[in-house]
């Protein structure tokens, strides 16, 4: 190999090295915050554990794995409005990529704590009437979710 060819190979390798290192780094870890308004504040409670397990398994089925590309921060308000407000502020301070909340009691404190982080709610009877969304077709803010439809 000629000296010039050798130098080209070395310089080319040196220039491409940062790209190779970047490619070897793992995926960005996404952070999901979960705020449950009801239930036991003991996260080892069987019902709470069953709900969390179902959520984690569904995410794993979609390719998300805790410790690899996902971190879940879970808090339970225990039906205490002041505790829920503090937990909402605490979770928003962690800068999650998205916040999931179960129960109408926790939606308002989350929407007061952030105007940019997406908030996904479940078990809310009337999100438009409660002011969480402008309409069912277009929420118009950082909140979206699923309504509870009871039987009459």
Language-model-detected regions and their locations in the chain:
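Short hydrophobic alpha-helices and adjacent helix-cap/hinge residues
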Residues: 1-152
């Amino acid at each position: 190999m000629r000296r010039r060819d050798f130098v080209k190979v070395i310089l080319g390798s040196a220039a491409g090295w940062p790209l190779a290192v970047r490619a070897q780094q793992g995926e960005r870890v996404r952070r999901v915050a979960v705020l449950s308004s009801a239930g036991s504040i003991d996260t080892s409670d069987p019902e709470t554990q069953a709900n969390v397990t179902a959520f984690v398994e569904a995410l794993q089925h979609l390719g998300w794995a805790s410790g690899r590309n996902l971190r879940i921060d879970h808090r339970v308000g225990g039906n205490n409005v002041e505790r829920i407000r503090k937990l909402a502020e605490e979770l928003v301070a962690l800068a999650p990529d998205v916040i999931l909340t179960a129960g109408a009691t926790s939606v308002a404190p989350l929407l007061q704590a952030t105007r940019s982080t997406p908030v996904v709610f479940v078990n809310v009877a009337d999100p438009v009437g409660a002011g969480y969304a402008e309409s069912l077709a277009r929420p118009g803010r950082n909140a979206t979710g699923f309504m509870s439809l009871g039987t009459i």
